[in-house]
Structures are given as structure tokens and as C-alpha cells.
Design a protein with these regions (language model features):
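Sec-dependent N-terminal signal peptides
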Residues: 4-13
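Short helix-adjacent coil turns
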Residues: 35-47
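Boundary at the C-terminal end of the N-terminal hydrophobic targeting segment
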Residues: 16-22
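C-terminal-biased regions
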Residues: 23-34, 52-183
Length: 183
């Protein structure tokens, strides 16, 4: 009887906790991320708003950034509130599943803090990854969901800061679930 209960528990828990991205899911994420990038390039706030999970919270202080798509569209048009800087520069290929990270792109030469550089990375994160606690803690997302995280880092000799865009695939739709900015 104990063996049967153990096996049932094992089968049940595997079903609950095994929601990892398949290769097909990863390609779908990259396809939709590419569509998001096209909407960014065209400054199509209506299309962009469909990729945001509302209410979107700031991962730093857990305050709501946008309650709904109207808030998003209003902020998108205001350059002071623009949070998608450089997100469209990450190169993704949804057919091959390839992500080409941007490494040490020179943004400004000889500024106050020296040369200013940017790096952009995209990666898939599962709850078993070493850095998973940071992303799951910041986003408040269940560890049952795999994440697609895009990081935009800008740095020079005196300052560095990063923005983290945390996405999930929900109902086969890519959704930005948290935005986190560190100095």
C-alpha cells in the first residue's frame, strides 16, 4: 500500500512540477518576442500592450507600473517613462531557436565615466537554474513556470545598471510579467 501511495504521489508531483519549456515552446517564445520587437520598432503601443500581463509590477518595490493597457499606452508615448530601451536590439531566430546576445556594444566614447557600453542577453530560466531564485523572487511567478529573461546592461568605469524583463508563456502567449531595474 505504501508503495502504491508513493508511486501515485511521485506521478502526481511530476505532473505538477514538470512544466518546462519544450523546444517547440522556446521557438514560440522567440517568435513572439520577435513580433514584440517589431511592434517596438514601429512604436505600435496597442500591439505591445498585448504582451504585458496586467497589472505589471516593478520587481524592485512591488508597486504597480501599469494597471491596464491604457496606462501602458499613455506611458509608452512619454519618453520619460520608457522602459523598453534597447530591447529590440537582441537578435533572435525563432526557426533555429538561436539567441545572439549583444556583447560590449559601444554606446558613447569618452563620457564622464569613460566609455559607455551595453550588453543584452536573452535566456531561458527554469527553477533549477543557479540564478533562478533572483528571477522568481523578483517576479513573484510560480516556480512551476519557466521564464524567458532579457537583460539589458549599461555600464562604464563608474556606473553599471541592468534592466530585467521577465516573460512567461501563458496560454501559448508571451507575457511580460515583471520588470526589474537595478542601479
Amino acid at each position: 500500500m505504501r508503495k502504491i501511495l508513493f508511486l501515485l504521489l511521485l506521478v502526481f508531483s511530476t505532473g505538477i512540477y514538470s512544466k518546462s519549456f519544450t523546444e517547440t515552446d522556446k521557438k514560440e517564445v522567440l517568435k513572439q518576442f520577435s513580433e514584440l520587437q517589431n511592434a517596438l520598432k514601429k512604436k505600435n503601443s496597442n500591439a505591445l500592450s498585448t504582451y504585458v500581463s496586467y497589472p505589471l509590477k516593478d520587481g524592485n518595490i512591488k508597486t504597480v507600473i501599469w494597471k491596464n493597457s491604457s496606462d501602458f499606452i499613455k506611458d509608452f508615448k512619454d519618453p520619460e517613462n520608457y522602459v523598453f530601451s534597447h530591447l529590440d536590439e537582441l537578435r533572435v531566430n525563432s526557426v533555429s531557436g538561436q539567441i545572439d546576445n549583444v556583447e560590449e556594444k559601444l554606446l558613447e566614447r569618452g563620457g564622464e565615466g569613460g566609455d559607455k557600453f551595453m550588453e543584452i542577453t536573452g535566456k531561458f530560466i527554469t527553477s533549477s537554474d543557479d540564478e533562478a531564485e533572483f528571477y522568481y523572487g523578483a517576479s513573484g511567478i510560480s516556480k512551476n513556470d519557466d521564464l524567458f529573461v532579457v537583460t539589458v546592461s549599461v555600464y562604464d568605469d563608474m556606473f553599471d545598471g541592468s534592466s530585467y524583463y521577465i516573460f512567461i508563456l501563458s496560454g501559448n502567449k508571451l507575457k511580460l510579467v515583471s520588470y526589474l531595474q537595478l542601479p
